[in-house]
Structure formats: C-alpha cells, structure tokens
C-alpha cells in the first residue's frame, strides 16, 4: 500500500512554538502537559488527547497521538477493546516508524494517528477515517493556534503590567529553545516561575 503525504511543518519548524508553549506551561506549574524528554516532544490537553513527536535519527521523526472523542481509527489492542475494525497505522510504513508507535499503543494510551517524517515529507498509512489529529489542538502547528492557546494559558497570570500582544508571543516562538527568563516574563509576568519555563524550553535542543 502506498503511503499518503501529509501537509505538516517539518519538525524544525514546529520546534520554536512547541518549546515556547512548553516554557509557558512550566512557568505556571503545568510542565507535564507540554515538555521535551530526550528525543520525545509531548503535548496533551489534560483531557485525554495527546500528541508526541519522537526523533528517531537521521533527520527522521514519528508524530503520533490520539483524540479520545474524534479518533475513529482503532489500532492494535484498541480494535479488540472497542469491538471495531482495526486500522493498521503502520501499513506500508518503513520499520523505523514502528518502535515509538508500538511502545505507545497500550490500554492506557491508545494511538489514533501515526505520521512519519523522512527528512523531507510527512507520510501516513492509507485510510479514509478521521484519525483525530486535527482535533488534538497541537499549538506548535501554526502561529494562530499557538498564539490563541498561549494567550488562553496566560490570561490569568498575576501582576502583569500589560496584556501581551501577538508580537510578544511571536518573540517567544522565535527564541524557541533559547527562551530567556526575561523574555518569558514579558508574557507571563513576574510571579510565575520564568526560570523553570526557560529550562523547559532548553530541553527542546537536539
């Protein structure tokens, strides 16, 4: 079966926004919801929907995750558990996709989508079902989504002199893994832990 191309930014283009959002989350004490752990970048919305980007070497990566409401694809044990036909998310995929997908496909963490980046293009297995990726709300995907979610997550930050504008959020994303505590304070104010936020951003360095 021929793989299907997926129109998504390359991992390097996702890095800045992902790191910036992780910095915001860590600064307010929500670091588990968005973080980097070695080669794995994680995001979840706190409601059971999640996405991980796993770097597997040679410029390649696997993006996988699940939306518990909108993923109509049932992979591996999920098919038997829910009594649904299985969607083979690895059909036609090279072997390097398999380890992160199989490791994540547990009864505690169903996998609804799995995309592979070969260094130039994202791909997925052929299927017609909604895999739930669009509903996960990954803030790293584009500027508008990142700004909206970053603004929502900082809306109740105490002691800010002014509400940050789009340029302030964009500056965080442009800095990415090099976010400084001072730059982060322009968005989150003086009370949240900007040092922890900057440390979280640094973990997105490869």
What spans do the regions from the language model cover?
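Short hydrophobic-aromatic micro-motifs
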Residues: 53, 61-63
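Short, solvent-exposed aromatic-acidic interface loops
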Residues: 65-73
